[in-house]
Amino acid sequence: METQSTGTEDGFTPVTHRGGRRAKKRQAEQSSAAGQDGEAGRMDTEEARPAKRPVFPPLSGDQLLTGKEETRKIPVPGNRYTPLKENWMKIFTPIVEHLGLQIRFNLKSRNVEIRTCKDTKDVSALTKAADFVKAFVLGFQVEDALALIRLDDLFLESFEITDVKPLKGDHLSRAIGRIAGKGGKTKFTIENVTRTRIVLADVHVHILGSFQNIKMARTAICNLILGNPPSKVYGNIRAVASRSADRF
C-alpha cells in the first residue's frame, strides 16, 4: 500500500492512505454539486415568483352579461293560472322596466320564462326576478313578493308539516288548524311579531323574510306542530323578538 511520509520533530511519520484522499475528493465534489443545485433551485423559485400580485379591475355588468343569454323557467301550478293572469301587469312592469329583462308565459310548457337582454344592467337581476315570480306562484301577494326585488337580505324558505312530525289524518288537520288559528289569528300574530309573511298551503309552509326573522317564525310554527299551546308560543316569540330589537 502506497503512503506519503513527512518528517516531524518527534520522529513519527504520519501516514495518509490514497483511499482517504479519494474519499475527501469525492465529498468535496458532492458538496459543490449540492451547492450548485441549491442555487439553481433558488434561482428557479425566484424566477417563478412574480414580482407583484396582479391587479384586475372589477368587471361591469355589461361586460359580465356579454355572450349567451341566460334564462330562468318557473313552473306554474294549475291553481295559480287565474291569479297570474289577473296580476300579470303587476308582475310584468317591475321585471321589464326596472330590471331590464324579458318575460313571457309559455302556454305549452306552462312556465314563466325570464331571460336577459341587451338592456339588462345588473348581474343579479335574473335571480331577483326568478325569486319574485316564484314567491307569487307559491301564494304570496304581489306587493309582498316585490320586496325580493327591492331588498337584498330577503329569502324564501319552504318546508312540510310532516317534516317536523309525521302526522296523518285528523292529527295533521289539527296541526294545520293550530298554525292558522281561528280566522287566521295565530298566523297573523306570528307574521306581525317576526316581521315575515307566511303562506300555509295544505301541508306546505312558505316563509318570506330575513334570515333571523325566518328562524324565529320557523321555530314558532314547529312548536305549534309539536303541540305547544298558542299562548306559550306567543310569549316565546315576543321574548325573542324583544331581545333581538334590544340587540340591534
Curated annotation (Swiss-Prot):
GO terms for cellular component: nucleolus; nucleoplasm; small-subunit processome. Its main location: nucleus. Residues 39-50 have a biased composition (Basic and acidic residues). It is found in: Nucleus, Nucleolus. GO terms for molecular function: RNA binding. It comes from the Eukaryota. Residues 169-221 form the KH domain. It holds the Pfam family KH_PNO1_2nd. InterPro entries: KH-I_PNO1_first, KH_dom, KH_dom_type_1_sf, KH_PNO1_2nd. Residues 1-63 are annotated as: Disordered. GO terms for biological process: ribosomal small subunit biogenesis. Keywords: Nucleus, RNA-binding. Belongs to the PNO1 family. Part of the small subunit (SSU) processome, first precursor of the small eukaryotic ribosomal subunit. During the assembly of the SSU processome in the nucleolus, many ribosome biogenesis factors, an RNA chaperone and ribosomal proteins associate with the nascent pre-rRNA and work in concert to generate RNA folding, modifications, rearrangements and cleavage as well as targeted degradation of pre-ribosomal RNA by the RNA exosome. Positively regulates dimethylation of two adjacent adenosines in the loop of a conserved hairpin near the 3'-end of 18S rRNA. Part of the small subunit (SSU) processome, composed of more than 70 proteins and the RNA chaperone small nucleolar RNA (snoRNA) U3. This is RNA-binding protein PNO1. It comes from Mus musculus (Mouse). The gene is Pno1.
